[in-house]
């Protein structure tokens, strides 16, 4: 009986030693991602959302990924400056690109620091801002991207920038 307990302890130790590095490698691999593969802003539009439930877009073809675009209430130039500042103020968000018509931001999750891409494109002629928020890795985001877009919508409405 003592031999079995000793073998059990050895097996548990082996499992702990092997699973730890494996999990670390998995997390690091999951965090590495090429945003260029997932982000396509500019007048050509956005990449469509994948079939996985971790992306929302105002230009999504699949209704389950759709969100309404933002409709500006005021002058596009002035409003766009406020939009840029508001996006930059979101928690754990880093502006990667902010120009006259495009914003690309990287949003990190609180615990595992996974990166999501938040992309906005302004069409000044009609005052429409198309928006896309997508996880770089994983299958489901548990609604994080949709909540991010709706939180941004709420902040911009509070500032009387969008309808």
Enumerate the predicted regions with their spans:
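Ser/Thr-rich, low-complexity intrinsically disordered terminal regions
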Residues: 31-163
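Sec-dependent bacterial lipoprotein signal peptides
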Residues: 7-29
